[in-house]
Structures are given as C-alpha cells and as structure tokens.
Amino acid sequence: MSNKTKLKDNKELLYQVVLSYKVSHNYPLKAFLIECKNKLNECIDMIWNNIKYTKKDNPKLPKSNEFKRELRNKLLENWNYASHYIDGIIKTSYSILQSWASNYKRGYRTKTKPIAKRLFVRVKTTLIKYDKEKGEIRITIKPRKDYLILNIKNEWFFDKVKNLTIGEIILKEKETFLTFKDNLNYSDKGMIVGVDSNLRSLDLFHPIEGWTRVDLTELHRIKEVYDRKIDFLKKLLKKFPLRAMRKINRLFERRRNRVKDFLHKLTIQLSRLFPDAIFVFEDLNKRRMYKSKYFNRKIDRVNWNGLIEKISYKTIVILVNPAYTSTICPICGSRMESQEGQVVYCSNCLNSFNRQLVGCYNIFKRGLGNIKEIMGGSGVTTTGVEVSFGKLMTPNPNVIYIVDYNGKYFNEIA
C-alpha cells in the first residue's frame, strides 16, 4: 500500500497516520459493556495489588509473562463473550495504571486506585472483518452467535478510507469510533519545517522560505468572547441555577466546536502551505507553565496539543525537547541573554536576534538531527542547514498569514 524504505540494517522506516471516525449504531450493547467495565475494574484491582514500590517510592507494575497469563485466565472465568476482549481489557488496564504511575512520579497523583466509570471496550483487529467492496464492518461479540454489523459505504468519509487498513475500534453504547491506518514514508518528504508554538502565533522556519508566521489572534478572540459570556453567567448561578447552567453548557459546547473548526482549517492550510514537509514541534507541557491567574487564562486559550494532534492526521510530525530553544545562539551555540522586547543577545559572538526566529530555527535544527539519526543520514533534503547569516538577522517575519475560513489556503497580510 505504501512505499517502504529500507535502511542499512534492513528496517522499514514508516510513519503511520491514524484516521478516526465516529459512526452511530442502535445495537443493544449496554449489558455487554457493563460486564466489560466490571472486568476492567477487576483487572485494575489485580494489577494494583501487585504493584511494588522502589526505595524512592516509584511504582513498578507487574509485567512478567507468568503474571499476565494468570491475570488473563482469572478474567476469563465466567466470561461469555469473545476471549479477545479480555486482551483489550488488560491492555486498557495497563494503559490507565501506567498513566497514573507516570503522574504519581511527578507529584500530580496520590496513591489512590483509578476506577473505570465509562462504558466502552477496545475491539482488537482479530474480532473485526472489513469488506472493502461492500463497505461492511463485522464485529464479533460472541463467536458464531452474536455480531455487530456496520455499513459505512454511505458515510461521508468512505472514499478516504476504502483502501486503508482498519485498526482498533472503540465500542460504546450508541456509537463506535473506527480507526484506519495509512503509512507515510519519511523519504517521500523533501523538507523540514521548524514550528515555534507561541501564545498568539506559530513561527515557522523553512530552509528556503525563511521565517514565516501564522497569526493565531482569531483563536484567542473566539475563546475570550466565550469566556466572558461564561464568566457573566457564573455570577447568576445562585439566582437561576438551572437556566444559567443550561446556558453555560451550551456556550462551552459552542466554544469547543468553534475551536475545533478553527484548528481543522489551520492544520489543513498549514499542510498545504508546505505539502512536502516534515513538521517539527516542541513537546510542550502546560502544567509547568502555570503562574498567576491572568497568565493561566492565557495559557488555557492556546491549544498546542490539539494542533499537533490534528496536523499529525495530515502529515509527518516530530516532537523535540523544548528546553532553551529560544536562548541558544544559532551561530555559535552559546546561551544568550534577553534584552528589551523580543530581542536576545549573544555575548560570545556579539550578535542580536529575534527570539521567535531563534526558537523556530533551533527547533528546525533539532528536528533535522533527529531525522538524520533515524534515517542514518539519508533520505531527507538537508537544504538550509547552513543558513545564510542574513536570514538569521531579519527582525521581522518574511510573510505573515491568517486562516481563511472560506478558502483552501492562508490569507497573506504582510
């Protein structure tokens, strides 16, 4: 289905894009999903009771094959459905507890056992039969007895996915989330673009186009307008609790939908701006950025993870360490000092730069280093690694774009 690049050690270098779609159904699954939830909590109990803690109080989950075999056999007792669902339940349990352990180490969680409350189950591909010609997906509930059949031939996304491989399915009471896998090749891409994610803009460094900026003021305006309306209604909760809460929930839903729509248009137009590029983003964590109440509101209005998630459906994305990207000199590599506004100064090579340009350029360089390490130094154009001195000294972006709500491409404003 895809071009496969062989490396020197005969490994295939592929990047997998997962597309997800929601399809409604009317099958009576509540009893089945309740049993799945009960088994999930039982599985979490068994793993939780076997967690061991190191001297530094770091939790270690039991992962031996013997333990997992006993766990599976125990969960299969009194189970009347396909046994492969138990494998999905075990996988989900480990995922939940690994997330808890990771947050516990950072001090974000206490020693409180997670409890599953939602009704859902992961369906392995071994329980799925996909007829591409008919557009029919058959999910086994009970082997040779009970099946859930979905026909997606008339769905709006069928033409996009009809030739793709179906992946894991999330089954809920009234809807299913279908995933389809598509493979991209690193060597199909000719350029690398570094993206510096800021509060009100995306600053991009392209080795040929230089410094480009995408203005995100409209995204902040959308969130700010709805935040003001919600804050006003919160003051009325004591007088009119039901009416105010109903309107607040409605505004939250509208806010969420408008933000989602903006991000979809932004990522589509961004991927069309540089269609042959690998995008390099910082692996940012908001939790470490919270300070004052006013600044927290600003941080809440950016959506870096949502942006990365949506653009990863459309092209190849790499995440790099964000540490010191805006303060390392692009010429000599020394740490720089901040001056007034967006200017940073290097006392070693005596040059001044714009902080945003330095940030996106250093992200570009880190992404290039990661690609070279992955690909053994081949397969991606390295044009622009030795960037001209003039490109790094520019005080302003070469081009500033904004999202066009009604078009396929960005609007240029400067």
Curated annotation (Swiss-Prot):
Zn(2+) binds at C329, C332, C346, C349. Signal peptide: none annotated. One of its GO terms (biological process) is DNA recombination. Pfam families: Cas12f1-like_TNB, OrfB_IS605. One of its GO terms (molecular function) is DNA binding. Keywords: DNA recombination, DNA-binding, Metal-binding, Transposable element, Transposition, Zinc. The keyword DNA-binding applies. In the N-terminal section; belongs to the transposase 2 family. In the C-terminal section; belongs to the transposase 35 family. This is TnpB-like protein MJ1635. It comes from Methanocaldococcus jannaschii (strain ATCC 43067 / DSM 2661 / JAL-1 / JCM 10045 / NBRC 100440) (Methanococcus jannaschii). The lineage of its organism: Archaea, Methanobacteriati, Methanobacteriota, Methanomada group, Methanococci.
